[in-house]
Regions:
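Catalytic loop of the DD-peptidase/beta-lactamase superfamily, centered on the K-T-G motif
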Residues: 1-137, 144-156, 177-241, 246-248
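Residue-level recognition of beta-strand termini and adjacent short loop/turns
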Residues: 167-169
Length: 248
C-alpha cells in the first residue's frame, strides 16, 4: 500500500527499500527509475559518514496536561455514536485507523461505537466497538505513549497512544499503528450528555484527496472530469465531519 517497494539488484549488489506515501504507484515507479542510476556509487572502502537527520520526529505524543474534573462523570460510561450515512454511502465509515486497507478488507472496519473511557492517574483506557471487533487501547496521559494490541478489519496492529484534556470538557486521543502511515486523532467535546467527536489524521485526509485529484482521470471519465475535481476537493470536509454521540 502507498508505494512501498523493495527492489533487489544482483548486478549492482544493492537492496533498495522505499515507502513513498504516494497513492499512485506508477508515479513512484517512474520516479525510482528516473533517479535509480544516480543512487549507485563506487565504494571507496571508507566508512560512510553519519548523516544528520534533516527532519525532526513527528509530534505523535500529546503533552501531559491537568486532568479534568469531568473524568468522574465520564468514568466507565458508554458513549453511543451516530452513524454518518454519507460516509457509509461513500465507503468511508469512520474508523480509528484512517488507512485504505481497513476499508478494502472483506471484514470492513468503520462505524466506531460504544466508546468507554477509564482513568487511572498517568494513563487511561479507551474501549470501542468497530465492525465485529472490540478493542481497548492504553493511552499515556503523562506525555509518554503506551502500546496496545488491536485488531481491525481482521488484521492485527500495535497501537501507540496518548491522551490529554485540552480543556475541562474536551479530551483528545492520538493513536498510531506500528507499521501504518497514518495517525488517528480524535477530540471528544462534552456538553452534558451530548458528545461531539471531531476526527482528523496525520497524514491529513486533505493530502490524500490532493494526491487523488492529480489523477482524477483514473477515477472519472472525461465527461465527469470537473465533477471529479469537485468531489475530491470536498472529500476532507466529508470524511472529517464531526460526529454526534450521547453518553448513556
Amino acid at each position: 500500500m502507498f508505494s512501498q517497494f523493495g527492489i533487489i539488484s544482483n548486478d549492482d549488489d544493492i537492496i533498495y527499500v522505499m515507502t513513498a506515501g504516494e497513492i499512485n504507484e506508477q508515479k513512484t515507479r517512474d520516479c525510482i527509475w528516473r533517479h535509480f542510476d544516480k543512487l549507485i556509487i563506487e565504494n571507496d572502502g571508507e566508512p560512510t559518514p553519519e548523516v544528520k537527520p534533516e527532519l525532526g520526529a513527528l509530534p505523535d505524543d500529546l503533552e501531559a496536561r491537568e486532568h479534568s474534573s469531568f473524568e468522574k462523570q465520564l468514568e466507565g460510561k458508554t458513549i453511543s455514536m451516530q452513524i454518518n450515512p454519507i460516509l457509509n454511502a461513500a465507503g468511508f465509515p469512520f474508523s480509528m485507523l484512517p488507512i485504505p486497507i481497513v476499508y478494502m478488507s472483506g471484514d470492513r472496519a468503520g462505524n466506531v461505537n460504544n466508546i468507554v473511557f477509564r482513568f487511572d492517574g498517568d494513563t487511561c483506557t479507551m474501549t470501542w466497538d468497530e465492525g465485529d471487533e472490540h478493542n481497548t487501547i492504553l493511552c499515556g496521559m503523562d506525555g509518554k505513549a503506551r502500546t496496545s494490541p488491536i485488531t481491525l478489519a481482521g488484521m492485527n496492529f500495535t497501537a501507540f497512544s496518548t491522551a490529554a484534556w485540552i480543556d475541562e470538557n474536551t479530551i483528545e486521543v492520538h493513536m498510531r499503528p506500528v507499521g501504518g502511515i497514518c495517525m488517528r486523532k480524535i477530540k471528544l467535546s462534552f456538553n452534558g450528555h451530548i458528545v461531539t467527536l471531531r476526527p482528523s489524521s496525520q497524514m491529513p485526509i486533505s493530502a490524500m484527496a490532493e494526491s487523488l485529484a492529480l489523477d482524477v482521470d483514473s477515477f472519472f471519465p472525461p465527461i465527469l472530469h470537473k465533477f471529479g475535481l469537485v468531489a475530491f476537493d470536498q472529500l476532507p470536509g466529508i470524511i472529517d465531519a464531526p460526529i454526534l454521540g450521547k453518553i448513556k
